[in-house]
């Protein structure tokens, strides 16, 4: 009984101390938690502020994607504008002057866009037009016109289409023959090609005239004799030079022989 009474008294004595110590500890814990929360909130506010500053700096600087997007959008807008307004782009037409050629005899030749040839000759009061040659095609499709130079025996140059042949007879007359070709589906584009000059010389007629053959033979003989005389003169000149060289060598040898004889006679004495 006494032991139980002592234990009860000790329990009752210890309870007031525990009640006194409990509120003090809870107050300390509350202060510590409030301090930690304030530090965490301050850290979070600092981190939020720094992230906002970095975001603001990045927002001020334009990104490469934004620049590329703006450029592509401007390009597409320009293409759309060109597609919607095709009347803005107008094609300017230019008139090309007809080319003019001058022959060795002073004659002027102009090629018109419709394929006509205009011949003109210079005079004291300006250029005098002679005639106009028109080249037409019977086919519906426009075929190419090829021109070439033709030179006569007197040195005059003329322009002749490629489908025409100019022949000069022995009497000196010029005759033109046209070569007709059948039109084909695959025709060449219209072009003008200047080829190398073609010399139209009168052919030498082969005759059995003995006088003419004799003159030709004599002319050839004279040329051969002239060449033979020239070669003989060159050969004689070469021989003369060789003789002069040998004479000089002979003189030097004679002088050397004399000196050797003198030396031998002095030694023998």
Swiss-Prot record:
Cellular component terms per the entry's GO annotation: ATF1-ATF4 transcription factor complex; nucleoplasm; nucleus; RNA polymerase II transcription regulator complex; transcription regulator complex
Region called Disordered, residue ranges: 1-90
Polar residues biased stretches: 9-18
Residues annotated as domain bZIP: 211-269
Residues with the Phosphoserine modification: 63, 196
Keyword field: Activator, DNA-binding, Isopeptide bond, Nucleus, Phosphoprotein, Transcription, Transcription regulation, Ubl conjugation
Residues annotated as domain KID: 31-90
Residue segments, region Leucine-zipper: 239-260
InterPro entries: bZIP (IPR004827), bZIP_sf (IPR046347), CREB1-like_pKID (IPR003102), Leuzip_CREB (IPR001630)
SUPFAM superfamilies: Leucine zipper domain
Cellular localization per UniProt: Nucleus
Subunit details: Binds DNA as a dimer. Interacts with HIPK2 and CDK3. Interacts with MOTS-c, a peptide produced by the mitochondrially encoded 12S rRNA MT-RNR1; the interaction occurs in the nucleus following metabolic stress.
Function text: Binds the cAMP response element (CRE) (consensus: 5'-GTGACGT[AC][AG]-3'), a sequence present in many viral and cellular promoters. Binds to the Tax-responsive element (TRE) of HTLV-I. Mediates PKA-induced stimulation of CRE-reporter genes. Represses the expression of FTH1 and other antioxidant detoxification genes. Triggers cell proliferation and transformation.
Name the UniProt record assigns to this protein: Cyclic AMP-dependent transcription factor ATF-1
Species per Swiss-Prot/TrEMBL record: Mus musculus (Mouse)
